Amino acid sequence: MATHKLLLLPGDGIGTEVMAEVSRLIDWLNKAGIASFETEHGLVGGAAYDADKVAITDATMALAQASDAVIFGAVGGPKWDAVPYDARPEAGLLRLRKDLALFANLRPAVCYPALAEASSLKPEVVEGLDIMIVRELTGGVYFGEPKTITDLGNGQKRAIDTQVYDTYEIERIGRVAFDLARKRRNKVTSMEKRNVMKTGVLWNEVITQVHAREYKDVQLEHQLADSGGMNLVKWPKQFDVIVTDNLFGDMLSDIAAMLTGSLGMLPSASLGAVDDTTGKRKAMYEPVHGSAPDIAGKGLANPVAMLASFGMALRYSLDMGELADKLDEAIAVVLARGLRTADIKSEGSTVVSTSQMGEAIVQEMQALHG
């Protein structure tokens, strides 16, 4: 049995609480002989700043480079609002993405049958929802230069952010989306703003070319990003895989998240390119939710997104798809049984703490393994 090296980065706020439930699951998998994991732990975000005055140390980055997968919690909080910009907690996350060359962000939006009532939309609109949003992660306006604020000297300031995309960046994210669609329902929707942005014109052109050359068997459609956001709310089940740039992907994935009822339910994966020699890729897995400092330490956090993120690591980095399927099933069974953390509680449900939810999911995994 191969041993997989994992780096666990809990981060700040509820990150430590939800990561504890991943550790619980890993410990059980190791003890049961189902899998073999070797784990390292590191600081990131505000926790790293408090210890080392940086958002992530070079030593922790070296551990990330050497791991088969990075499992990331959440960073940030009001405590660090006044720290230098380059050392802000979010800078640790951005460095991980950039140094590991994690260009593809996968955000599934899945509505479990037991939670259709938790959505703000009608149950029939979201029941059975299963969307994958593929967001380009290392280009666009978040990384483009120049990025400045200039004092104009007349009591005014000017801020500049730069949206930049090259052909190869669009090609590789397009291929990720098309490859995923082939394993799902064979449809890709590309979203941009070609009506007002030159990067949108290029994005549309390149995605169309990649489709024509390599993926004619996959259905492709284009939507403007603002219209696409409207359609996500109006008729979300029309979508299978959505591919879009960094900025729009950030927004659209949060819209999709709330279709499911809670940010606490949604995982994500950030993937690098496949190494031609090893066949492996750098990858990081994290919940979509933030550090939620207002509920940190109270046992209220929902660990499902964190556990589901670990499930994505099993599927996309560790070649353990069957185990990932069982984890998905365990989560669904526990929810169907009526267990809920506070963020997804409903009439007649049993409200449980972070650790109780994590323990219930691990117990269900045990039952599924006989």
Swiss-Prot record:
Tell me where in or outside the cell this protein is found. Answer: Cytoplasm
Per UniProt, the keywords (alphabetical) are: Amino-acid biosynthesis, Branched-chain amino acid biosynthesis, Cytoplasm, Leucine biosynthesis, Magnesium, Manganese, Metal-binding, NAD, Oxidoreductase
Q: Name one GO biological process term.
A: L-leucine biosynthetic process
At which positions is NAD(+) bound? 77-90, 290-302
Q: Which cofactor does it need?
A: Mg(2+); Mn(2+)
Binding partners and assembly = Homodimer.
Under what name is this protein listed?
3-isopropylmalate dehydrogenase
Q: Which organism is it from?
A: Rhodopseudomonas palustris (strain HaA2)
Gene name on record?
leuB
